[in-house]
From Swiss-Prot:
GO BP term, pick one: riboflavin biosynthetic process
Name the record gives this protein: 6,7-dimethyl-8-ribityllumazine synthase
EC number: 2.5.1.78
Record keywords, A-Z: Riboflavin biosynthesis, Transferase
Organism: Chlorobium chlorochromatii (strain CaD3)
Annotated (2S)-2-hydroxy-3-oxobutyl phosphate binding sites: S87, T88, R129
Transferase keyword on record: yes
Amino acid sequence: MHIEQIEGTLSAAGMRIALVVSRFNDFIGQKLVEGAVDCIRRHGGSEEQMAIYRCPGAFELPMVSKKAALSGKYDAVIALGVIIRGSTPHFDVIAAEATKGIAQASLETMIPIAFGVLTTENLEQAIERAGTKAGNKGFDAAMTAIEMVNLYRQM
């Protein structure tokens, strides 16, 4: 018995990608952008095929990501942001809605929207996940986007 195995490759050559980035906690968000751009370049993509959309906060990421996906200009969207827990329930609400909204936007548009939103307990954890001790989640999200576009192309 032979079962066909289909998976995406990691070539971004010719791929058009939108990065949607929240400005809140921008000093960390910019590191996520740098990680994503680095990943796309390392896998054959070019800056000419990328666009960066900046929105106020993580709550707006799903709306802007969906709009970019529906534009027909992009093969994938990468949503990047930073949500750090504070002393109120605001963190839980924003983290849940951003996560749910990004997933819903991807399902509704059938365009891969990679989730690169940090949800951390404190500033130190966010910094670690934006390029220091724990890798760069922007880089990881870009890898997901690239792989998903190539998987979709084989379906």
